[in-house]
């Protein structure tokens, strides 16, 4: 007998191969198509009445309705879970939906969250204002002050929430230390890895329990598609924690199932799909899932170029007489930031960052208005270079004190460095500096 040939599923594939093949290791079984098909359907035919009853009764796994599952989305979920090193994933209609569902799956009325201050403005508003109306409060802390983080945890705290790279200044947090604090208090560490990407860092390997992404950013990569995804690390013991009855006790709206018992390591995303997505419906469309799969296929290639260009822009800005300060971990004056950057981002990172121009908000806006190659818009992580004035746009809903808490000044300019030729990027920046001298 010949030697057993391993299948793709049996092999330990590298990241660049995983991003191309997971979920569709073989061509489509019906059509032999190599590309993942777009299953543009709202619903699925049952073979007979018993088959329908078994699907609804959870005795037969499979598709029931497009709000909950879709074959195209399933492949995207399998692939991003593999890239992040998780056990399961759930794709949803936006990054905001991913964060909201994650918090709603952990915290109920009367509960509490501890969150880093340096987070996306939309998430800050969700935690500081919107969820308060539903009985969930948040304490915002300096994620670099570990004593402050631990001191903010209460008996009713249900999670510690951070971002891999802070928004908008790309500060690096100590994931391992924060995970240790969260686990000491029997709560999960939730991390937004949108800016980090699984190509540069896999937070689950450092102790994070749940990872969220705005897939709109690096995953999609081209500024065309809105979506989000939640990845379940599968390592948090919900039963041992004793703080999450919604995951461990029988659910009256779903056949009395205990998600921790029924879904095991994938309990967290399974409950979101079965309850929150079922009832509130922030579903990702199959076409968007297909576009995100296209994005994943080139993720490593694009991110390498993003990072390479960004580090050259940082070096350029550091030498500019009109620049007061560059906020990027690679040039931070804080030795702890330098240490964390080298530890968590050995291959570089932070293609979205800010700098402070000498002058006021008018000088910052004048500089932005003279840029030609950079697009002035609210997105980030596009292959095209982007720019915005956070104080008057993305963080305008925050008061001056809240902006200062997040490291945003009137003269702060946020850049998202694209994949254009670096000479063209630097030329555009230099032209704008020359125009506002």
For the regions a language model picked out, list residue spans one by one:
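N-terminal glycine-rich, Lys/His-bearing helix-loop that initiates the first secondary-structure elements
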Residues: 1-60
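Short hydrophobic/aromatic beta-strand micro-patches
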Residues: 231, 354-356, 416-418
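Conserved small-domain helix->loop->beta segment predominantly found in fold-type I
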Residues: 280-283, 287-289, 294, 298, ...
